[in-house]
Amino acid sequence: VISPEMVTRSGLRWYKNRVVVNYDMDAKNLLKAQPSDSEDGVNKLLTMSYVTASRLLLANSFGTLDSAHVYKLSRIYPFHQFARSARPLDAFTADYPRVYGMKLTDKWSSLTFFNEDEEHSQKIAVRLSGIEGHGGAGLQADKRYYVYDFWNDRLIGIFKGSDVLEQELRKGEARQMAVREMESNPQVLSTDRHLLQGLLELSEVSWNEETKELAGYAELVAGEPMRIAIASNGWNPQSCSVSDAEVKCSSEKNSEDIVKLSLESARGGKVFWKFSFKK
């Protein structure tokens, strides 16, 4: 199991070195994750191990795990290799941290809400433009941001940088979110491949104004579709294409402004993709 005290002790070490790697040899058992009556127990254990410890010592052999457990476990691998960890954003405004943030680029942050209560739901909030460490996420007040929920695979909404983001979390839930500055052209919001939602599995993603194409590279797992959530931002999605004829490429409109691009390869590996749009 992973207790609230364990998460707190590990997370607060950020303020010693600004980077946290916890070498505690207490292995984590996915089959005993709490709460046990929903997927939130396993999701929480994996999320908070990644966010506050930067490693996971697994107690289970793969022979004891079903395909659903293995799939969830693979959402936190690989661990990122650069020297940066999530910061407890409410470290000095709460009894213990429930909000963690990590700047990935100047326009993109990772945000984690943690409900330590395994019996009751709880509202958790952060001021998006507030001071980091004092209850804020340090974003720009004059910008607008998409917030996308990883485990629940949904767009939470579009927020002003001056807004307070408040969410009601289920009992024992850890909600992992990507916060991306809103652009005028189509943009990637998230993927279903990794907890950091595009940082490790996607590269060189850019918008070509001349060809009206969003393009980039994706690192695919053999036999597993990768779904990329894209905000069309007022543009109409047209067609997708890939550099490898053996890679399947398809798309479907998920909502009025969100389209899902799906890539699948039998052998895996890196593939170049592009997705065309028109006004």
What are the residue ranges of the model-derived segments?
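Glycan-recognition surfaces
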Residues: 1-67, 93
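Extended Gly/Ser/Thr-rich low-complexity repeat segments
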Residues: 225-239, 267-279
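C-terminal beta-strand-rich structural cap/linker in extracellular carbohydrate-active enzymes
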Residues: 158-199, 253-279
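Extended hydrophobic-aromatic, low-complexity segments
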Residues: 60, 120-124, 156-159, 167-168, ...
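Carbohydrate-binding surface patches
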Residues: 49-52, 57, 92-139, 178-180, ...
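Solvent-exposed beta-hairpin/edge-strand motifs
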Residues: 130-153, 230-246
